[in-house]
Amino acid sequence: MSKKNSELKARFRRSPEWKNFRKHMAELYDNKDAITGKPLRKGWNLHHMDMAVENYKDLCEDKYIPLNRASHELIHTAFRYSYAIDKLVYYVQKMEEINKKKEK
């Protein structure tokens, strides 16, 4: 992302329009992280699912989700490696099976 785009986004995030929308979205999700269901922590992110810079100001509820920092990093990583999601699910399930056997 260019420096100019970063500055435009930062300026928009300081606007009352953005701040009100951000608050509205947190309330819409009961002040919980959309992925984990945990309470939103200080510094939480309102994640834009539409990655196009030109759509940054399109404040449509369907294009945003509130996330804590770790979930926000996770969703961006998963997006970059979306081709590997099926493998990730397979290995996580395998880990769960292995660790359930140890609990018995």
Task: Please state what every model-predicted region is.
Residues 1-20, 37-39, 82-104:
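A boundary/linker detector
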Residues 34-66, 75-81, 86:
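Histidine-centered nuclease catalytic patch
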Residues 17-45, 70:
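Short cysteine-rich loop/turn motifs with clustered Cys
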Residues 63-74, 94-104:
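Short Fe-S-cluster ligation motifs
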Residues 2-7, 27-30, 48-49, 69:
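Generic alpha-helix detector with strongest preference for long hydrophobic helices that associate
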Residues 4, 19, 30-32, 67, ...:
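Intrinsic-disorder/low-complexity regions
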Residues 18, 24-27, 50, 54, ...:
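A generic structural signal for solvent-exposed, polar alpha-helical segments
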